[in-house]
Amino acid sequence: MVALKGIPKVLSPELLFALARMGHGDEIVLADANFPTSSICQCGPVEIRADGLDIPQLLEAVLRLLPLDTYVESPAAVMDLVPSDKEKGLQTPIWKRYESLLLEADCKKTLMKLERFEFYERAKKAFAVVATGEMALYGNIILKKGTLDLGPS
C-alpha cells in the first residue's frame, strides 16, 4: 500500500516505480491468474506481483496515472479466444468492463484482439508483467504507454 495523496491504494510501490520508468511505447501486461507470468518474465519483462487483486480494479487505478498511446491503432490489447472456445460460444464479459474503463479514461479506440501465441510473444517484449488474482478466462490485457502534453516549458 502507498501512503500518498491521490495514489490508489491497490498500486504497490513496485508497480508505481515501473509505471514511472516506462517510456512512450513501452507496454505493461495485467495478467490473469492462469497467465505464465514467471515464464514470460524470463525473457526480460519485470515481474510484479499483485496477487489477490482483480484486473478491473487494478486497471482502473493504472488508468488514473498512465497516459495511453494515441498514435497507434489501439493502446490496449487482449488475448483472443482460441478457435475451440469460439466454437463453444464462450463469452468474455470482462472485456466489456475493460472497454468501459478505457472509455472513462478517454480512450475511444477499441480493444485489439491478439491470437494467443502472438499475445505471448508481445508480452515477452513488455516492460513489465503484473501477476494478478483475476480468475476470468481471457482476462489478460496489454497497455501501451503514451505521452503527456505538458504544454510549453
Curated annotation (Swiss-Prot):
The active site is at 24 (proton donor), 69, 120. Belongs to the RbsD / FucU family. Gene3D superfamilies: RbsD-like domain. Substrate binds at residues 32, 79, 120, 138, 140. Its EC number is 5.1.3.29. Mainly homodimer, but also exists as homotetramer, homooctamer, and homodecamer. The homodimeric form seems catalytically inactive. Involved in the interconversion between alpha- and beta-L-fucoses. L-Fucose (6-deoxy-L-galactose) exists as alpha-L-fucose (29.5%) and beta-L-fucose (70.5%), the beta-form is metabolized through the salvage pathway. GDP-L-fucose formed either by the de novo or salvage pathways is transported into the endoplasmic reticulum, where it serves as a substrate for N- and O-glycosylations by fucosyltransferases. Fucosylated structures expressed on cell surfaces or secreted in biological fluids are believed to play a critical role in cell-cell adhesion and recognition processes. Pathway: Carbohydrate metabolism; L-fucose metabolism. InterPro entries: RbsD-like_sf, RbsD/FucU_mutarotase, RbsD_FucU. Keywords: Isomerase. One of its GO terms (molecular function) is fucose binding. It catalyses: alpha-L-fucose = beta-L-fucose. Widely expressed in various tissues and cell lines, including kidney, liver, and pancreas, marginally in muscle and testis. GO terms for cellular component: cytosol. The keyword Magnesium does not apply. The keyword S-adenosyl-L-methionine does not apply. One of its GO terms (biological process) is GDP-L-fucose salvage. This is Fucose mutarotase. Disruption phenotype: Deficient female mice show reduced sexual receptivity, as measured by lordosis quotient and masculinized sexual behaviors in female mice. Display a reduced number of tyrosine hydroxylase-positive neurons in the anteroventral periventricular nucleus, a sexually dimorphic feature in rats and mice. Embryos at 16.5 dpc have reduced alpha-feto-protein levels and reduced fucosylation of alpha-feto-protein.
